[in-house]
Swiss-Prot record:
Catalytic activity: a ubiquinone + NADH + 5 H(+)(in) = a ubiquinol + NAD(+) + 4 H(+)(out)
Transmembrane segments: 5-23, 30-52, 81-103, 112-129, 133-155, 168-190, 200-222, 243-262, 272-294, 301-320, 324-346, 367-389, 409-431, 452-471, 514-536, 607-629, 634-653
UniProt-recorded name of the protein: NADH-ubiquinone oxidoreductase chain 5
Gene Ontology terms describing biological process: ATP synthesis coupled electron transport; electron transport coupled proton transport
Keywords attached to this entry: Electron transport, Membrane, Mitochondrion, Mitochondrion inner membrane, NAD, Respiratory chain, Translocase, Transmembrane, Transmembrane helix, Transport, Ubiquinone
Top-rank lineage group of the source organism: Eukaryota
GO CC list: mitochondrial inner membrane
Localization (cell): Mitochondrion inner membrane
E.C. number(s) listed in UniProt: 7.1.1.2
InterPro entries for this protein: NADH_DH_su5_C, NADHpl_OxRdtase_5_subgr, ND/Mrp_TM, NU5C-like, Proton_antipo_N
Gene3D superfamilies given in the database record: 1.20.5.2700
Paired cysteines (S-S): none
């Protein structure tokens, strides 16, 4: 059963990719969807068996690297963390496969698309189930390559190619530091196997663990789109919408958070790394929510909300609340996939227009999509008793429950981020469904709900967005829950704050984020509905124009990267090419050698004078040289050759 979870998606990918021409579009769709759905059912069984019965499973297939003390086994482990990660990955992957049957129906390259989707799922399973850092890195690189292939799926579009290259190169920065971290683990601990590394971690110097932890955090920053290495995330929206749902809801962007959770027995011994995670997540949350508020593309707004929620997960990791981070990761995957697929349904209905300022009044034409996006947005805003409520607010409470300066500061910053998150959710719903129609008459007239393949995944995700958090809260975060007794998530006793969070935080600070989000949402709707001129006039003022431009241009971070990093590197590269490659190297190498030989040959030809006495002199000099060579045989051959060349040149010089 456990090997089937790993093998089935790659079998579907191979069949659809290599034999898609023989199978046809429908055959490729049936095979890939069947493989992923069966894998999902098996993963649910594994979740029950491993999680509830506390029976972790390890499978060692074969020895991959065997070099004296360095041994890597191609092995997989299924513990409570692994099966919990497989749950959203495979459920959402199977729903995206079904959704894509309708969404990509008019595309001529269906087989290739479904092959890429299944391959992406397989690589994510490898990343999650690998029992050592090297095997995890195989999956890590695999999802990077698959995201490149999927984002640039419509390869004739320049924007898609640019976005895929941006995502690929930005992730290479994180991969570089992750590789350095793995080398540091190998140097300090002598192995990359999780069990060995985590059992030796308490005996290692804290400074070494800090260096390793910082490298792992930078690796996670790129993959999980934390501020600084986040620039690829909104650009990746150029791919098909099912790809956006798969990459940015449950799979690739959560890989960095998974890496930090898996490394919890390591980073728990470095308070510096935990503090970095705490502040990094808080800054990411407020940064992304501010930028998302000023975006006009419906998919980019949802992408920035993903970034904001990932920031909250990293905050939870910084608080050592790994179970809350995992719970929020799983919850977020469902309602974020619902938002992305709902956005895809809207885009499909309005002739592929993504600017939601040109929507308006779609509630009458897309009632099901409106209901699902409303449910998912309320869950995103942590509305009471929906899925997001049980994890998002608990992260904010945990920050306050640490009762430190950093904890309380992060609570305040994250609350501001949560307020802005709710504001742009309200903005999307209002401008898309409730405002007066702003699109063309033909677009509105032809707006319609999709078929069963388009709507069934949305309904299933909406059900998860309502009930999943309530049904599983005691499993993941309940006091005394035995779900993580296998130590897949390790919390140092010094960092245990769950009881303080539950019983020590005043009730007013628990409900404060919800009160603020509701008040600001009502204020935003009232301003837009009854005083629309005030917002418009503010935007036209000089201050409002500059403010809007600053946030709309994403804090000018990309401009800074282009002007001061990319251009600097390109200038340095061109100067290196000019001075070294085309300068010194060519002067010494091909050009210099050619000129030297040409000059030498010209000097030799000038010795041919046609005068007999000159030839007699050459013969005499040759005899003398031969005698000198015989008597000075102890001198090195290179010195002799040098003497001969100098003699010839001196003769030539005297001749001239």
């Amino acid at each position: 059963m456990y090997l089937s979870i790993i093998i089935l998606p790659v079998l579907g990918s191979i069949v659809a990719g290599f034999f898609g021409r023989k199978l046809g579009v429908r055959g490729a769709q049936i095979i890939t969807c069947s493989c992923v759905i069966v894998t999902t059912i098996l993963a649910l069984l594994a979740w029950v068996e491993v999680g509830f019965n506390n029976i972790p499973v390890t499978i060692n297939l074969f020895r991959w690297i065997d070099s004296e003390w360095f041994n890597i086994i191609w092995g997989f482990q299924f513990d409570s963390l692994t099966v919990s990660m497989l749950l959203p990955v495979l459920i959402i992957s199977s729903l995206v496969h079904i959704y894509s049957i309708s969404y990509m129906s008019g595309d001529p390259h269906n087989q290739r698309f479904f092959s890429y989707l299944s391959l992406f799922t397989f690589m994510m399973i490898i990343l999650v189930t690998g029992n050592n850092y090297l095997l995890m890195f195989v999956g890590w690189e695999g999802v990077g390559v698959c995201s490149y292939l999927l984002v640039s799926f419509w390869f004739t579009r320049i924007a898609a190619n640019q976005s895929s290259i941006s995502a690929f190169l930005t992730n290479r920065v994180g991969d570089c530091f992750l590789t350095i971290g793995m080398f540091a683990i190998l140097w300090s601990l002598g192995n990359l196997d999780y069990a060995t590394v985590f059992s030796l971690a308490p005996y290692i110097n804290e400074n070494i663990i800090t260096i390793i932890g910082i490298c792992l955090v930078i690796g996670a920053m790129a993959k999980s789109s934390q501020v600084g290495l986040h620039v690829w995330l909104p650009m990746a929206m150029e791919g098909p919408t099912p790809v956006s749902a798969l990459i940015h809801a449950a799979t690739m962007v959560t890989a960095g958070v998974y890496l930090l959770m898996r490394s919890s027995p390591l980073i728990e011994y470095s308070s510096t790394v935990l503090l970095i995670c705490l502040w990094l997540g808080a800054i990411t949350t407020v940064f992304s929510s501010l930028v998302g508020l000023f975006q006009q593309d419906i998919k980019k707004v949802i992408a920035y909300s993903t970034m904001s929620q990932l920031g909250l997960m990293v905050v939870a990791i910084g608080l050592s609340s790994y179970n809350i981070a995992l719970f929020h990761l799983v919850n977020h995957a469902f309602y974020k996939a619902a938002l992305f697929l709902g956005a895809g349904s809207i885009i499909h209905a309005v002739a592929d227009n993504q600017d939601f300022r040109k929507y308006g009044g779609l509630r009458e034409f897309l009632p099901l999509t409106y209901s699902i996006i409303l449910i998912a947005s309320l869950s995103l805003a942590a509305f009471p008793f929906l899925t997001g409520f049980y994890s998002k607010d608990l992260i904010l409470e945990s920050a306050f429950g640490q009762f430190t300066f950093s904890g309380v500061s992060v609570y305040a910053i994250s609350t501001i981020g949560a307020i802005f998150t709710t504001l742009y959710s309200v903005k999307v719903i209002y401008l898309t469904f409730l405002a007066n129609p702003n699109g063309s008459l033909m677009t509105v007239r032809h707006a319609h709900e999709g078929d069963i393949f388009l709507t069934l995944p949305l309904v299933i995700l909406a059900i998860f967005s309502i009930f999943f958090g309530y049904l599983t809260k005691d499993i993941f975060i309940g006091l005394g829950s035995s779900f993580f007794v296998d130590n897949s998530l390790y919390v140092h006793p010094v960092h245990e704050i769950l009881i303080d969070t539950e019983f020590g935080v005043p009730t007013v600070f628990k409900i404060l984020p919800f009160i603020f989000t509701v008040l600001f949402s009502i204020l935003a709707i009232l301003l837009s509905e009854f005083i629309p001129g005030s917002v418009f006039n503010f935007k036209l003022s000089r201050f409002g124009y500059n403010l809007f431009g600053f946030f709309n241009q994403r804090f000018l971070i990309e401009m800074f990267y282009n002007n001061y990093i990319t251009n600097l590197v390109l200038t340095l590269g061109s100067q290196t090419t000019k001075v070294l490659d085309k300068g010194s190297v060519e002067l010494i190498g091909p050009f210099g050698l050619e000129k030297g030989l040409m000059n030498f040959s010209k000097s030799l030809t000038k010795l041919s004078t046609g005068v007999v006495t000159s030839y007699a002199l050459y013969i005499l000099l040759g005899l003398i040289s031969f005698i000198i060579i015989l008597y000075l045989s102890q001198i090195s051959s290179s010195l002799i050759v040098l003497l001969i060349i100098l003699t010839l040149f001196s003769l030539n010089f005297n001749k001239q």
